[in-house]
A protein has these predicted regions:
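Register position in tetratricopeptide repeats
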Residues: 24, 58, 92-93, 126, ...
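Structural marker of alpha-solenoid helical repeat scaffolds
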Residues: 41, 74-76, 109-110, 143-144, ...
Length: 448
């Protein structure tokens, strides 16, 4: 009828079913046509007018929706759907408190409260009012013990409130009523995992996968928990089950690779890291894991190749640049190492080790003034560090500013005398200088 424009008579219930069907499957143009035909045949139907309003709201025609809703409210001021649609409209306008007021009014007008509790929960979530959101979702779960969407939302609220023990208490009560619910066992396991109670988490995940042997999420969390407990081979076995039950994921391949690495099986680790980047070539972390394993094997050429892959995907991670520089140092590519450490600093990685590494490379290539500038920057965030003061002393000495060199050497010795050996490693000419030796000797005697 709707596609041919032939007109037939339908009773009101049939029209409502047709319209709701089209709305549910996303064919709103056909739903609108059905509403139009329905109102032509049943012009006084409030339910059809409410469906018309719902379609207006969906299309963001809020002014028209409000106008139509006002007309309906005059006819049926105590219709709960009027207040639900009012709530939907003002919610779209960002007026979530007003939406809540309308939904609370709707609650007083109907015995079918579950959908309204769900809508209330969502409105409270918009306001980050997790406690009230949780209470409404709990109402949904109490009304329908198999409302798993609301169950997830309850746990989400507990998570956002960081009330993990309270979540466990709630889930235990839920499990008492519905003991064969794999979703609840999975969620209680997650709460135990957050609290680092891994043995209890493992038991919960075991129940989840016993109840549903095809529950991928249960096996995945079980594998992660076994990994946390150091049971790497068992973790691998469970990750492999997830690959059998569902499509392969780069995440699972990476986790298997890490487990093999923990077991000392580098060859297997490399195999699975390569599977991970094959599955997801844009997984920068996968390329980094390959980098690290080849770095540990002292295969710096391959490590350099893989870190370049990681950086081509994500060049905003200081960790990648730090590894890049460490590799370049091993290959004696000093200018590239300098570039990498400078990138770390520009990305906000102001760890003292980054500053020191950059200073040492600049010193090695004879860029003493540049090294001094970096030390000055380092000192702003790292005061009274022997690592910095001894390098100040050495650099000032090399730049023929012995007065400053002596000041920093004395300061360095007061912080950590034994660390003066760094002068021998980095500034041998300064270390063996007669004046330096006398300062070191005199300080030691004075402090004995």
């Amino acid at each position: 009828m709707l596609k041919t424009n032939n007109v037939y008579f339908f009773d009101l219930t049939e029209f409502e079913e047709i319209i709701i069907h089209y709305i549910d499957i996303g064919k709103h143009s056909l739903a609108k046509k059905a509403v139009k035909l329905g109102l032509e045949q049943h012009p006084d139907s409030i339910d059809l007018k409410l469906l018309q309003i719902e379609l207006c709201v969906f299309e963001n025609k809020l002014v028209l929706a409000k106008k139509l809703l006002t007309q309906v409210e005059i006819l049926e001021p105590n219709n709960d759907e009027v207040f639900i649609q009012k709530a939907t409209i003002v919610s779209k306008e960002g007026k979530h408190k007003e939406a809540i007021e309308n939904l609370i009014k709707a609650l007083t007008l109907t015995d079918d409260k579950e959908d309204i509790w769900t809508l209330l929960g969502m409105e409270y979530l918009y306001l980050d009012d997790f406690e009230n959101a949780r209470l409404n979702f709990i109402n949904c779960v109490n009304a329908d013990i198999e409302d798993y969407s609301s169950l997830y939302n309850v746990v989400y609220c507990f998570d956002m409130e960081e009330k993990h023990q309270e979540a466990i208490d709630f889930l235990n009560k839920y499990i008492d009523k519905n003991p064969y619910c794999e979703v609840a066992w999975h969620q209680i396991g997650r709460q135990y995992s957050v609290l680092k109670r891994h043995e209890e988490a493992l038991s919960a995940y075991d129940f989840a996968v016993i109840i549903d042997e095809l529950f991928v999420g249960g096996y995945l969390e079980k594998a992660k928990t076994l990994e946390a407990l150091g049971a790497y081979q068992e973790a691998i076995d469970n990750y492999l089950i997830t690959l059998e039950l569902d499509d392969a994921t780069a995440f699972a391949f990476v986790r298997i690779g890490e487990c093999y690495q923990q077991l000392g099986n580098a060859a297997a680790a490399i195999l699975y890291y390569k599977k991970a980047v094959h599955e997801d070539p844009l997984l920068a972390k996968g390329w980094l894991y390959l980098t690290n394993i080849y770095f540990d094997q002292k295969n710096y050429e391959k490590a350099a190749y893989y870190i370049s892959k990681a950086l081509s995907i994500d060049d905003s991670d200081a960790l990648y640049w730090r590894r890049y520089s460490e590799i370049k140092l091993k290959l004696n590519f000093f200018e590239e190492a300098i570039k990498g450490f400078e990138m770390c600093l520009s990305l906000g990685d102001e760890d003292i080790n980054v500053f020191i590494a950059l200073v040492d490379v600049l010193t090695f290539v004879g860029e003493f003034n540049a090294a001094l500038s970096i030390l000055i920057k380092a000192q702003k965030g790292h005061k009274n560090f022997a690592e910095i003061e001894y390098r100040f002393a050495g650099l000032f000495w090399l730049l023929n500013k012995q007065k400053f060199g002596i000041e920093h050497l004395i300061k360095a010795m007061n912080i950590d005398y034994d660390y003066h050996i760094i002068l021998k490693e980095l500034f041998s000419s300064v270390y063996f200088n007669e004046g330096t030796q006398k300062l070191l000797s005199d300080f030691k005697k004075a402090t004995e």
